[in-house]
Amino acid sequence: NKFNPTFTAETHNFPTGIAPFPGASTGTGGRIRDTISIGKGGSMVAGTAGYCVGKLFTNHYKKMDCHSPEHILLRASDGASDYGNKIGEPLIQGFARDFSTDYNDKHIEWLKPIMFSGGIGVMKNSNTKKDHAKNGMLIIRIGGPAYKIGIGGGSASSKNQSSSDYLSNIMAVQ
């Protein structure tokens, strides 16, 4: 069998800002799900994770009711690697950036972090196309009902975040 490389990527920015460990963990999990669900199934090879945060080593985050960049970097890194490690996907590289500047008498920095999860995988050439269900086949649905947590996450994460309302959309995170 010939193999095809697969490359997947996902961001989990808003959840990682609210709850760094589980936010990054579920970001990695969602990306791994995509890797193994492609076609008739793929296999994981390795992952990467990246983080962009506001200015490091400052105390002004305590006033804004949000996690410090240091806390996000440490806990998100733990979450991303924890998920992959538990199912056999190593993180082989990553990146981290901080950003803060003063421009035209305004302070600008990333309050909402960026959490990037990328993956490399392989898929057998014979698995690239899914089969159609045929009469008489048993079809099984796996999963449960949707819960109220996480509802509205896409719209909440797209809102401008300020220091006064950063955690106000906490129910939008799973």
Where are the predicted features?
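Glycine/proline-enriched, intrinsically flexible loops and inter-domain linkers
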Residues: 1-174
